[in-house]
Each structure stands twice: as C-alpha cells, then as structure tokens.
Amino acid sequence: MTFSGHTARKRFGQHWLINERVLDRIVEAAELQDGDRVLEVGPGRGALTERLLASAAAAIHAVELDRDLVAGLQQTFASHPKFSLQEGDVLSVPLELSGGVPANKVVANIPYNITGPLLDRLIGRLDRPVDFSYQRLVLLVQHEVAQRIRARPGHSNFSALSVRMQLLGRCSHVCPVPPRCFQPPPKVQSEVICIDPFPPERRPTAALSRGVERLLKMAFLSRRKMLRNTLAPVGSTDLLQSLAEEAGISLQQRPQDVAPEAWVALAKGLNQVDSVA
C-alpha cells in the first residue's frame, strides 16, 4: 500500500477497518457474482477494495472524499481493469460507473455523521423515492443506529426509523464490530448490516407514504403513550377505533408495538376517510 504517513482525519470521521475477519464478512454478505457492479463508499486505504477486486464482481467503483487517499488509491489500484475511482462527496457526486452504468450493489464503511443522508440518497425515503433500486447494501454503521434500523415491533429500540427502513427493504444483521477492529478505535460499538431494498412496486404508494409519515410523526413524538392519545389529532375516538380495527391493531398499544405493515394499513384507512370528507 502507498499510504505511509497518512493518519486518520477526525474531520472526515476516518477510522480504518483493519480486522481481516470483518472485512471478509462484509464481502461475503454482499454475495458478489459475475456481472455485479459494486459502489464502494469510503474506500479509505483500500483494505476492503482489495478484497472486492478479488471477488467475482465485474466492476468496483469507489467514491472517496479525502484527496490524499485518492492519490494513494489511484497509485495502488489504477492499473486494475475492474477499478474506477471518483473523488468527491458521496452525497453530491454522480454515483454511476464509467459510461453512466449504475451499480447494483453497495458496500460502505461510512462516516457515522452522514449515515442518515447517505441512506436517503441510496434508498430514498418513504415520501421521496429514488429512481433506481440497488439489489443489496452492506453497510458498516454505528451499533445504536443498526439496532434501530432492524428492531422488531415490541422491542425498546423499535422506532419511526425502524418502520421507515423496514418498509423500504429487508434489513438484517451481519456481524458486530467492536472498537478494536479499527485504527484508530472509535468510541462507539459498530455493526455490519445488510439491506435489500424493495423494488418500487413493493413499496407504499406516494399517497400512503405521506400518510404513514404523518402518523409516525404524531405517534412517536410521545412513544410511551398509547395510540388513543398520540393519534388523537386524527379525529374522534370512534373514527380512531374504526381505523385501528381495520388495521388489526389496538388503541391500547404504544407506537413501538405496531408493525410497519399495520402503519400502512392505518394510513390507507385514514386516506380513504380524508378522500370522502
């Protein structure tokens, strides 16, 4: 490698993943096959890049913000026929491979302070879908965020984020990543997760998505209160009871007990009422 003298920069949130087993698990989770085109976010010093290039994937397109690292990556991998590199902010630069061809899988060891915005760009939001759906994303994120993304109804970590993400794709745990797996070690625990985004036809419609967002904002504002209280602005008690029965839930439940699909059903009933009113 040609990164001698380069130290991790705090302003970029840099922590190099150095644990070989975790690096291998990330590549395994991506299930790379012949023809796959991979977008690697934050290649850093290239430890994961090297493994991706050795996989069956057809192309690896890396996006790196740190100019010094870009120079090292170019020097190390530029001669590899499967490698291409884009310098810039992953939140704003084009993410397509050369020739405008989109990647179909994403592998990312991202600065934790851009996790939310990056997920918005790669997967979209309920109320703002993306035009293109990746087949799989393997992401190294802060453990606390991972817990919220994949938490199931009834768990203390189940939140509005859980509902949103699980309506956008299938979210699963890959492996824990303790601080000692990085150089320098971060102050928080980390986790590798896998997200398989749903195609557009499996996602809630735009109208339903707006309804779900409206309900989530009301309900999780006071997550410990029962739905009969948090959803009171929706309408009368009788209306709420009717909508809840149609959605298969109880107004005695708390927001964290309601499954993502039930929020969609509740939004559908509410939209029907609004269209008649």
Curated annotation (Swiss-Prot):
Q: What class of enzyme is it?
A: transferase
Presence of the UniProt keyword rRNA processing in the record: yes
List GO molecular-function terms, semicolon-separated: 16S rRNA (adenine(1518)-N(6)/adenine(1519)-N(6))-dimethyltransferase activity; RNA binding
Superkingdom field: Bacteria
Question: What reaction gets catalysed by this protein?
Answer: adenosine(1518)/adenosine(1519) in 16S rRNA + 4 S-adenosyl-L-methionine = N(6)-dimethyladenosine(1518)/N(6)-dimethyladenosine(1519) in 16S rRNA + 4 S-adenosyl-L-homocysteine + 4 H(+)
* Compartments (UniProt record): Cytoplasm
The record's annotation in InterPro entries points to: KsgA/Erm, rRNA_Ade_diMease-like_C, rRNA_Ade_Mease_Trfase_CS, rRNA_Ade_methylase_Trfase_N, rRNA_adenine_dimethylase, SAM-dependent_MTases_sf
The family note in this entry says: Belongs to the class I-like SAM-binding methyltransferase superfamily. rRNA adenine N(6)-methyltransferase family. RsmA subfamily.
Q: What is this protein called?
A: Ribosomal RNA small subunit methyltransferase A
Organism whose genome encodes this protein: Synechococcus sp. (strain CC9311)
- State the organism's lineage: Bacteria, Bacillati, Cyanobacteriota, Cyanophyceae, Synechococcales
